[in-house]
Amino acid sequence: MAPKAEKKPAEKKPAEEKKAEKTPKAGKKLPKESGSSGADKKKKKSKKSIETYKIYIFKVLKQVHPDIGISSKSMGIMNSFINDIFEKLAQESSRLARINKKPTITSREIQTAVRLVLPGELAKHAVSEGTKAVTKFTSS
C-alpha cells in the first residue's frame, strides 16, 4: 500500500504545476480557445433532457381521438397531473411496504395503492390494465 501512496503525490505535483501554468493564461483568450468555445456553445445548446410524459400522452390521445390535438399548456397540465398521481402511488405503496415490514415494493403493493388512491371504477380499470401489462411483460 505504501507504493500507491507514493504514486498519488507524484501525480498531484505535475497537475498542480499545470494548473499554476494555466491560471495566468486564463486571463488571455487565444484564437484556439475562442474556436473551441464556439464548439462549446454548440454543446451548450443541447440541454439536459427532462423526462416528461408528453410523447405518451400524445400517443394515447391519437389512439382515443385521432382528429383532436392538444395545446402545450394542456400538455403541461396533463404532464403535471401524471407526475402527481405517480408520486401519490409511490408514497402509498411505500407506506404499505413499510407497514408490512417488507424491504421491496412489489406489484401487490402497487395494486393496493392504486385501489386506495384512485376512486371506484377508475381503480378497477387501472388494476385490470396493470395486470394485463405485467402479464405481457413477464410472458415476453
From Swiss-Prot:
PANTHER family: HISTONE H2B
Coiled coil: none
Post-translational modifications reported in the UniProt record: Can be acetylated to form H2BK6ac, H2BK33ac and H2BK34ac.
Induction field: By gibberellins GA1, GA3, GA4 and GA9.
Residues where N6-acetyllysine is found: 7, 28-29
InterPro entries (alphabetical): Histone-fold (IPR009072), Histone_H2A/H2B/H3 (IPR007125), Histone_H2B (IPR000558), HISTONE_H2B_site (IPR055333)
Protein name: Histone H2B.2
Pfam family of the protein (one): Histone
